[in-house]
């Protein structure tokens, strides 16, 4: 039966439009006007996207299992103390799923490619907010709890998640309707402009990460003496922080494929490694939070401001709705009332 299934053809970099090109990747490209069926079939053949997809699709199910375990098996969801952790676990399910879907269906057309990654950026911004919510609830150093920064921390993180989504979407094509529309779907052509777009995208995600981790950086790198929250979670926080910086390095540098173009087209290029280390880092982050929750539960119950629906689920809901509105606006200008057919390949 499997022999009757014809897998889609793959192409080299010179055979696909420039918008589909990746630095240092020479071969393994899928048809730039693939059908949805071809995109799904490509999961089962080796292309330069195959491992990008599976390295995020499979972990999605692990985080979903973890979420369902807390909700259905342990039934801890009734305790408000657990709500921030549930929001975080939901974000851990959403961002790898959005990423794997974006990489799967991004070759249906140029327009589909942009829209897929708009959603991907929104999901990453939601994950950054999920991280802020759990840090606020479980990982702030003792001496900062109930301080001005702590009381405003989640609100600022919500704003950051919205700015992050907007800036990341802007980095692809510019301002919708003003700088691009359905008749002009292209990235800036100059090398300087392309580098600026890359820098903007990096800033869009590095800035929220750095802000989210201010309390954690202070706790594990700076703080000394009483009120610094020293426990077994600190070692794991060191580990996931190190993995996060390495993940960012891979995303920014496109190593190793830039050193040997064509040698890592299918296995071992930076985006695959970026996915792998991002997931491992997220796992260590989750583990560190669980250790903080167990070790500090009594102290946090006594000193932490009340955990409410508004500052957990409400904050996440507002961020998600805002992100979807941003994605809608950036996607809307890629369409016209009459519709625009994809250019033939």
UniProtKB/Swiss-Prot annotation:
Subcellular localization: Membrane
UniProt-listed InterPro entries: AdipoR/HlyIII-related
Keyword terms of this UniProt record: Developmental protein, Differentiation, Lipid-binding, Membrane, Oogenesis, Receptor, Steroid-binding, Transmembrane, Transmembrane helix
GO BP field: oogenesis
UniProt main location, coarse: membrane
Membrane-topology annotation of the record: Multi-pass membrane protein
One Pfam match: HlyIII
Residue ranges, Extracellular side: 74-80, 136-148, 223-272, 336-345
Single annotated GO MF: steroid binding
Bilayer-spanning residue ranges: 53-73, 81-101, 115-135, 149-169, 202-222, 273-293, 315-335
Annotated GO CC locations: membrane
Chain ranges on the Cytoplasmic side, renumbered to this chain: 1-52, 102-114, 170-201, 294-314
Family: Belongs to the ADIPOR family.
Summary of the function given for this chain in its UniProt record: Steroid membrane receptor. Binds progesterone. May be involved in oocyte maturation.
Protein name: Membrane progestin receptor gamma-A
Organism: Danio rerio
